[in-house]
Structures are given as C-alpha cells and as structure tokens.
Amino acid sequence: MMSQLAAPHVTTPHQDGFAMPAEWAPHDAVWMIWPYRTDNWREQGVPAQKTFARVAEAIAQNTPVIMGVPARYMADAQKVMPVNVTLVEMESDDAWMRDTGPTIVLNQAGERRGIDWQFNAWGGELGGLYEDWRQDEKVAAQVLDYHQAAGYAAPLILEGGSIHVDGEGTLLTTAECLLNPNRNPHLSKAEIEQLMRDYLSISTIIWLEEGVYNDETDGHIDNMCCFVRPGEVALHWTDDENDPQYARSVAAYEVLSAARDAQGRELKIWKLPAPGPLHATKEEAQGVDSGDAVERLAGSRLAGSYVNFLISNQQIIFPLLDEKTDDVARDLLQQMFPDYLISGVPAREILLGGGNIHCITQQIPTAK
C-alpha cells in the first residue's frame, strides 16, 4: 500500500479544521514498539521486553494495543506479548513510540489525520542518543498507513513527549527541549510557537523552563508536567531543597501558578512526589552492550517520575518505581481521576532505557 504521506497535505491541520485532542478523549488503540537494542536495554533486552508486555497487558484491559515489531524479532515477540496484543511488522531504531509515532488530529466531523514530525534521536549530532535513526523516521507514516489516515509532514523536529494539550486550546512544553539548539536552531521561539498553532490548533502555550533533572531527552514535558483535565495539571515535585530537582520543580510551579489557560482559567496544580532519588546499579549498567547508543553508567541518576503515565479510555497506567512512594502516587492519581481504573506496572526497566510508560506509548484517538 502506498504511503498516505507520499504526497502529504500542503495545508496545515489548523487551516483544515483539525486539532490535537486531549489524552482523555476516547482511543481506538494504543501503539507500542518492541524493545531490542542491546546497547540500550540490558540483558539482551529481555527484562525490558517482559516489562513492555506487562504495560501492554495493563492497557489492553480497556484499549486495544498494537505493537510494531522488526521482522527478525517477530517470533520472540509472539512468545512474550499477550495474545490480545496485535503484532505488526515494522522496522525501528528503538522503542519510543511517543516520540517517533504520529500525533493524531481530529476535526469536528470526527475525521482523523496524523502529523509526521521530523525526528533526530533527541539531538542529532549535538547530543543525540544514537547515530542512525533512519528507521525511526519512517514509523509515523507506517502507523498512519495502518489506520488509513492521511498525514501532514511538519517542517519541525519534535518528539511527542515534548508536548501535552488540554483539548481546549492550551499546550504545555519546556524550553529546555523545544528551544534547544540541537532541535530546530534555525527557528525562533515565535516561529516554533506559530508552528504549534498551525499544526496542533492551540492558542495558548505555557512554557516551563526545564523538565526533570538528568532527563536525557533534554527535559520532555511528559516526564515533568501533564494535564489532568482542563484547568488542572500534575507536576513532578520534591520537597528536598538539596535535590537538584527542587529548583526545577519550584520554577515550574511558579510559572504554572501565574499562568492562565486558553479559556482564561487559573490552573489547579497537583504535586506528584518524585520517587527515589533513583540510580542505576553496577549490575544494571554492566548488562548493557557497548554500541552506538549513549553509554549507561553505574550510579547515574535516573529521571524517574510518576507524571510519565498514560491516560487511555478511563484508565491510568502509571509506573511503579519506588516502594516508598508508589502508594502515595497511586492515591494521588485516584484523587485526580476518581472514576478511572488506576493500574500500576513495575517500570524500572523502562526507566533504565531512558523513559517510561508515556514515552513508549502513542494513542490513536477515536474517529467518528
């Protein structure tokens, strides 16, 4: 089947009446990618693969899960993945569907299209996490083909984890990532903001200066802060003034407290406590092969965050990261989402690879 993106729309989603819905809008499916890079996932990827299977199993309670799997690993995936997960042959360079997959936009008639952003492995030659991302660049088009959705080729390097929207005109992001010179150095802040308006149909952008400390994505918003519902956000928080995260969280809180969303509302801010601090062990670091990917070092601070959860069809799938704080996070999430199923999945193996549950998933909002 010829790619719908072979001749992408020359207009923009906003011109055509399309907008990115909030994550709590209904989903037809959630996509994931099989983790296989032995220079990123320890012990030949086996612990991560088992963890991805548990995440898929949790999501599949309410939402169909589709997983892209390189052909050479299909037999392995069939042994590990739950039978109700649809496995689709798809090449990739790593397993971060949030960042390489398409951003789906809908119009008032319920039609579905997708945005294929440019991708450079979180920084290209200036801090990118691996050297060759040519397969990753093809992922979004393949997902759109699967759903027979037409697409827009956006003239912007952007990962899905760097944006959150409330579905009512407001976008959250971080300057640390979106204005990083290793992403779109030729574009000004004003030009990037205009592209956000053109492609996502938002009107108000709330800029946090930084994301989570030592986040190798250059501070993705989806690890730091997200919308709970219109007018409410969850923020990664620590009360420890000696922690390098403290100043980042306080600065974000001040911005959010002063902000007004696209509808003129003040924001209610939920503080989600940081786990840990968490660090990679010697055993964990030694289990990763040397290769093209960024080196995994024993003792390195892990950017663990409970904000890195997925909202899908009245369910929250969140990472279990620290026995001391997991229950606190669960209770807070249940308060934030009183009518939702709250599903925790042990997720340290994902964190060791550089992200978490939101980073490895990408929702396909329901078309009417």
Swiss-Prot record:
Top-rank lineage group of the source organism: Bacteria
Enzyme class of the recorded protein, top EC level: hydrolase
EC number: 3.5.3.12
Catalytic activity reported: agmatine + H2O = N-carbamoylputrescine + NH4(+)
SUPFAM superfamilies: Pentein
BP GO annotations: putrescine biosynthetic process
Molecular function terms from GO: agmatine deiminase activity; protein-arginine deiminase activity
Keywords noted in UniProt: Hydrolase
Catalytic residues (UniProt): 359
The keyword Transcription is assigned to this record: no
HAMAP family xref list: Agmatine_deimin
NCBIfam families given in the database record: agmatine_aguA, PRK13551.1
Family the entry assigns: Belongs to the agmatine deiminase family.
Protein name from the UniProt record: Putative agmatine deiminase
Organism: Pectobacterium atrosepticum (strain SCRI 1043 / ATCC BAA-672) (Erwinia carotovora subsp. atroseptica)
